[in-house]
Amino acid sequence: MPVAALIREEIEIPENVNVEINGNTVAVKSGAKELRRDLMYPGIEISTEDGKVVIECTFPRKVQTAIVGTYRSHIQNMITGVTDGFEYKLVIRYAHFPMKVSAKGNTVTIDNFLGEKYTRTAKIMDGVTVKVSGEEVIVSGANKEFVGQTAANIEQATKVKGRDTRIFQDGIYIVEKAGKVL
């Protein structure tokens, strides 16, 4: 089976976005938003030329081919994050005991979940904002991984353990991920 001598992925840089590559660190900036990420793997080189980010690998193995595609996705998500941002929508569901959800500082507090006396908490990652309005929770930010992790933290905080989830359906559930309805 013939092997490719060179793998080259190119990513267009929009006009209002600035991409800087310093060693292994890729920095993407647009306006006030900036994301940095260390991308280092032996044999893979990242550079900018003619308004494009170029990821190259000569005589790649399977793992290096996969890593090139992964880095392309990471950089594309960074560019999308600083230009448009990412938004997850969660919905609050309860049958009998109304939950009170609020976001303060870097935590989301959930009171009266299934009539419990204690407060459940979920961590908000850096650079992520959480807005609670009625029975909807909106998680938004520039870093896709941090926004997704914050939404998952909120969803996991209302996980019912030791009960049949077909009956006890109270909780906070993700209904939209970065524009995709679930």
From Swiss-Prot:
SUPFAM superfamilies per the UniProt record, alphabetical: Ribosomal protein L6
Gene Ontology CC, one term: cytosolic large ribosomal subunit
Record InterPro entries: Ribosomal_uL6-like, Ribosomal_uL6-like_a/b-dom_sf, Ribosomal_uL6_a/b-dom, Ribosomal_uL6_arc, Ribosomal_uL6_CS2
Domain of life: Archaea
Keywords: Ribonucleoprotein, Ribosomal protein, RNA-binding, rRNA-binding
A biological process from GO: cytoplasmic translation
Keyword Signal: no
Pfam families in alphabetical order: Ribosomal_L6
Molecular function GO terms recorded: rRNA binding; structural constituent of ribosome
NCBIfam families: PRK05518.1 (NF004037), uL6_arch (TIGR03653)
Family the entry assigns: Belongs to the universal ribosomal protein uL6 family.
Biological function: This protein binds to the 23S rRNA, and is important in its secondary structure. It is located near the subunit interface in the base of the L7/L12 stalk, and near the tRNA binding site of the peptidyltransferase center.
Subunit note: Part of the 50S ribosomal subunit.
Listed PANTHER family: 60S RIBOSOMAL PROTEIN L9, 60S/50S RIBOSOMAL PROTEIN L6/L9
Protein's name according to its UniProt entry: Large ribosomal subunit protein uL6
Source organism (scientific name): Methanococcus maripaludis (strain C5 / ATCC BAA-1333)
Gene name of the record: rpl6
